[in-house]
C-alpha cells in the first residue's frame, strides 16, 4: 500500500513511485500473490498461476505493455496501478509520452482518435461488476465471478501476468474473438494500410489487442 497512488496527478508523481517501489517484469513469477490497491479497488489480491506472458489460450496482437507504449485509452487507463504491474510497462510508455495521469488526451492514442465508451456506459451495459444488468454475459456483472471493474483490458493485463479464472477467462477470450468483426468491416471498406479509413474502428481493434494496421 502506498497512499501516494491515490494522489497521482503528474508523470513526475508516477516516476517517483516507480523509482521507489516499482517491480521489474523479471521479478514476477508463478506462485506470486499480487496485492491490488488503487483508486477503484483496495484489498483485492490474486495469485499468478503461470509465469507472465506464458500459456496463453489466445493470440493477442500486442502485450499490455506494448499497447500502453503505442498509445491506448487516451493515456489514462492504469496510471494508479503502478505497483500491480511491471514497472517497464509504465517506464516505456512514459518515455514515449503516452501516459496522461491528469486529463485524458486523445492525441496520444495510436490512431489519434477516441474509440471507447465511458466507464458509466460499461456499467449500464453489464460489462463490469456491480452493475446488476444481465446482458449477453451476465457473469461479467457479478463481482463474485468478475473482479475486474475496469473492463476487458484490465482482465487482459491480469491474464497476461498469469492469473487464471477459468469461467471469466473463457468469456473474455470469446469477446476478444468476436471483436474480429471490426477487422472484417475494415477489410471490406478500406484499402490495405489506409489508416485514415475507419480510424476509430482501428483504434478500437488495437485496444482489444487486434492488429489495427490492416
Describe these PLM feature segments.
Residues 197-208, 212:
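Charge-dense, extended regions
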Amino acid at each position: 500500500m502506498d497512499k501516494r497512488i491515490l494522489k497521482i496527478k503528474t508523470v513526475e508523481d508516477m516516476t517517483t513511485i516507480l523509482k521507489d517501489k516499482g517491480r521489474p517484469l523479471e521479478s514476477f513469477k508463478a506462485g506470486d500473490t499480487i496485492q491490488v490497491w488503487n483508486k477503484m479497488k483496495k484489498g483485492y489480491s490474486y495469485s499468478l498461476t503461470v509465469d507472465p506472458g506464458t500459456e496463453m489460450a489466445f493470440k493477442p496482437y500486442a502485450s499490455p505493455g506494448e499497447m500502453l507504449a503505442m498509445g491506448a485509452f487516451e493515456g489514462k487507463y492504469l496510471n494508479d496501478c503502478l505497483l500491480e504491474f511491471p514497472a517497464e510497462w509504465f517506464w516505456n510508455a512514459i518515455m514515449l509520452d503516452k501516459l496522461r495521469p491528469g486529463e485524458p488526451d486523445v492525441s496520444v492514442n495510436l490512431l489519434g482518435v477516441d474509440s471507447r465508451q465511458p466507464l458509466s456506459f460499461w456499467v449500464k451495459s453489464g460489462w463490469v461488476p456491480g452493475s446488476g444488468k444481465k446482458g449477453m454475459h451476465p457473469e461479467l456483472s457479478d463481482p463474485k465471478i468478475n473482479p475486474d471493474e475496469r473492463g476487458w483490458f484490465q482482465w487482459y493485463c491480469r491474464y497476461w501476468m498469469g492469473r487464471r479464472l477459468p469461467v471469466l477467462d473463457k468469456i473474455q477470450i470469446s469477446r476478444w474473438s468476436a471483436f474480429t468483426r471490426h477487422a472484417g468491416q475494415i477489410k471490406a471498406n478500406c484499402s490495405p494500410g489506409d489508416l485514415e479509413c475507419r480510424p476509430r474502428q482501428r483504434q478500437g481493434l488495437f485496444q482489444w489487442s487486434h492488429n489495427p494496421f490492416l
